[in-house]
């Protein structure tokens, strides 16, 4: 019984794999990138490559900026000025920083103007707002989700609904958070976020970029048409997923007898490439920037290359209230929600999407 209990308590994970072609008009690749809003790490691996092109390097170095605002009152995100300045003129993203989704109150502003609040029971009751229990609360409901459509509210700022929400955030239950903010503007107008929040402690940040060349890297052999692989011919998509995790974590893949840290090795069949280029970007990275990277990698094979494939991997913030679109996200024991593209030289691609136990199935 004890063993069975431990198995039940073990965190479950879900990995969804699909294949398509970038030229297919039904391809979902762009939509899935655009609706995974809160990304903290982006990595791409290019086998048989020792240096990045200037165009790709410029894309990598221009994935920012984003902003950190300390002790920002929540009511600042629902003012008419904020809505008209940022939400209506572009895509605005906000996420509470250093809050734990399973323990603390957390907030996220989606680019479509939806404000998502994940509140503990006491805070939820004190705000007086309407919401619903978290889907991951269990029998004893301790977390509630509140969704506020700021675009809808802005249509009638004299409404009782807007007055009630504004009163709740300003007077009834004032809430303050440290926020990460970013704004993707649609026009040529310069960002005014620094000046707009100048009365608060605000800092501008650029994502951190790590570039490295991996020598004599043992890589799985893949066939774009075979997600499940073919014995002695090509590896499975799941095997590649595990291998990428090891590469990104800088795990030694030699599987030598005296290696007591890891016995993992590259799946077979495999091939050794003389060099591979690994780039990792860390920060508050917008989907719009990831779309540009993906588009550029799609055109990587426009000219003949030795590499048969490249990968683009994206990890979301573990404590964001949502994963894809408005899908509620929970932490439990991992909080992972991530996706990976394997881009082949014939424009086929594999898309792998992974979530933890407290998540819906990826879209």
UniProtKB/Swiss-Prot annotation:
GO terms for molecular function: ribonuclease P activity; ribonuclease P RNA binding. InterPro entries: RNase_P_Rpp40. GO terms for biological process: endonucleolytic cleavage in ITS1 to separate SSU-rRNA from 5.8S rRNA and LSU-rRNA from tricistronic rRNA transcript (SSU-rRNA, 5.8S rRNA, LSU-rRNA); tRNA 5'-leader removal. Pfam families: Ribonuc_P_40. It is found in: Nucleus, Nucleolus. GO terms for cellular component: multimeric ribonuclease P complex; nucleolar ribonuclease P complex; nucleoplasm; nucleus; ribonuclease MRP complex. Keywords: Nucleus, RNA-binding, rRNA processing, tRNA processing. It comes from the Eukaryota. Component of ribonuclease P, a ribonucleoprotein complex that generates mature tRNA molecules by cleaving their 5'-ends. Also a component of the MRP ribonuclease complex, which cleaves pre-rRNA sequences. Component of nuclear RNase P and RNase MRP ribonucleoproteins. RNase P consists of a catalytic RNA moiety and about 10 protein subunits; POP1, POP4, POP5, POP7, RPP14, RPP21, RPP25, RPP30, RPP38 and RPP40. Within the RNase P complex, POP1, POP7 and RPP25 form the 'finger' subcomplex, POP5, RPP14, RPP40 and homodimeric RPP30 form the 'palm' subcomplex, and RPP21, POP4 and RPP38 form the 'wrist' subcomplex. All subunits of the RNase P complex interact with the catalytic RNA. Several subunits of RNase P are also part of the RNase MRP complex. This is Ribonuclease P protein subunit p40. It comes from Homo sapiens. The lineage of its organism: Eukaryota, Metazoa, Chordata, Craniata, Vertebrata.
